[in-house]
Amino acid sequence: MENKMEYEIKEETLVVYFYGEIDGSNVSLYRNKLNVILAMNEDDVIFDFKHTTFIDSAGVGLVLGRYQQLSKEGRKLAVSRLSNTAYKVFELSGLFEIMEYLKEAQI
């Protein structure tokens, strides 16, 4: 699966879809693209990981960094459709204490 990112606006929420892997080898590319997308939009954000096959600590750092950026702007970030393994990583990292996890039906 190709590593890529797509986005759309759904009901005044920016939904960003990640495909493939998010790791140290590509996280800076994702960060740069996200900075452009987030700057063009003032909506709350959902990161959808349904098609993400792997995420490491660099990917978790990417999510945390965007959360901090959006929080400073008064915006919310939620994550959705993590694999079981990624869900455990996010949970152990304490990310669900600061951001919401959405199930598929909530998107």
How should these model regions be labeled?
Residues D56:
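ABC-family nucleotide-binding domains
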Residues M1-T53, Y67-I107:
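STAS-like cytosolic regulatory interaction modules
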